[in-house]
Each structure stands twice: as structure tokens, then as C-alpha cells.
């Protein structure tokens, strides 16, 4: 998420940090 877990999102989707962040925030609120 972008709200402080951007690093985690970067590991989840290193090629789609912004999009992955948005999806994680939207689906899991991470």
C-alpha cells in the first residue's frame, strides 16, 4: 500500500509498483 507499505508492494510487484500498490490497497488494504 501506499500508505506506508510501498516497500512491501515493491516486492509484490517490482514492475508495477504504482498499479500493484493500488490493487493491494483496494483488495487487502495493505
Swiss-Prot record:
Disulfide topology: none
Keywords on record: Alpha-amylase inhibitor, Lectin
Keyword Kinase listed: no
Superkingdom field: Eukaryota
GO MF terms held by the record: alpha-amylase inhibitor activity; carbohydrate binding
Function noted in UniProt: Lectin and alpha-amylase inhibitor. Acts as a defensive protein against insects.
Similarity section: Belongs to the leguminous lectin family.
Protein's name in the database: Putative alpha-amylase inhibitor
Amino acid at each position: 500500500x501506499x500508505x506506508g507499505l510501498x516497500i512491501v508492494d515493491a516486492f509484490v510487484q517490482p514492475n508495477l509498483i504504482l498499479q500493484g500498490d493500488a490493487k493491494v490497497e483496494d483488495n487487502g488494504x495493505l
